[in-house]
Amino acid sequence: MKKLYFSTFVQGLEKPVEAMLRKEGGVAVERVVPGAALYRSVREPAMPFVHQTFSVLFQMKPVAGVDDAVKRLLSSGGWLDRFPYEETQGKRFRIVTAMGDKLVAANMRYVDMLEKIICENTGMRTYRERPDVELWVLCRPEAAYFLWRLGKQSATRQEGQLRTDVCAVVSFLAACGAKNVTVLGCTNVSLPAALKNGGARALTCVCPDRASAKLIEGKLRGVRVCEGSSGYTDVADGSQQADVQHLPVKAEKTAGLESDLRNALFEARRILDADGRLIVIASLAHAESTLRKTQGVRMLARYDLTLSGQRSAIWVMTTKPTDVEESLIEQ
């Protein structure tokens, strides 16, 4: 029997995430909305391209706020049948209330009443400091949900690194399975790790300094790491099927930064084969103008999103000189 699940991800990546969900075995997508997807699955999902995943206990029509959602739960007991009772005995839980992607406070009198009902019917007990289970009352424009959160947030990120769920989407867009892939200007581990997990046959990381090269050498095995300029590498002409470039969005915009990106784009044209794919992740302020002016690359798709509070995008491009319209994501 397929259970109903709800997963969140970075808003702006709806199309690639939906395509990735549809490629998962045993998954039936019901709805994809900004920053989230509702789907059924025969097994508990563990997908690297989403941020948080929940089991859906109850769906409600849109409400004005979390207090209205909690009151509606109190007046309807149908959701009690959805609890996984084999997992509830002795578990500690807390209730989390949220509007969209922001946590908000609810009327504690209503929350206490909801906690009491759950304790009486499931064998769980409240423990707000260090719970085993989080039950979310989530209000969104399309619906209100009562959710059982599964596992922990999968999208870890260290300072200066991309979130792991974004990196997994980039790996999918690069179509790197069983292919030669190069990361130009590689300064973090999360991106090459996602490309390697995506099935890259041979992965080359060109790092701007020794510290970045040493970091990647210590974290990833089976990856060729070299130090040098992104605009001048020893990678053979036409030997790569994908090239990925990430410009840290909080870096200061300088003439040198623009020059480095321009040189890296020219280098990508040299090392990519005729069907190669070029992916750039950067803030609009850093890259939009340079990408628009660069000759010899053709835009396949652009996904606008927010990274580290900055308006950014993922550009998917090709060096293939053709006017024939291509489908980025094969259905």
Predicted regions and their residues:
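Active-site phosphate-binding and catalytic loops of NTP-dependent enzymes
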Residues: 120-133
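Class I S-adenosyl-L-methionine-dependent methyltransferase catalytic core
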Residues: 1-25, 31-44, 105, 130-132, ...
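Short, solvent-exposed coil/turn linker segments
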Residues: 78-84, 127, 202, 229-230
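A short alpha->loop->secondary-structure connector
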Residues: 117, 124, 153
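Non-catalytic nucleic-acid substrate-recognition regions in nucleic-acid-modifying enzymes
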Residues: 1-121
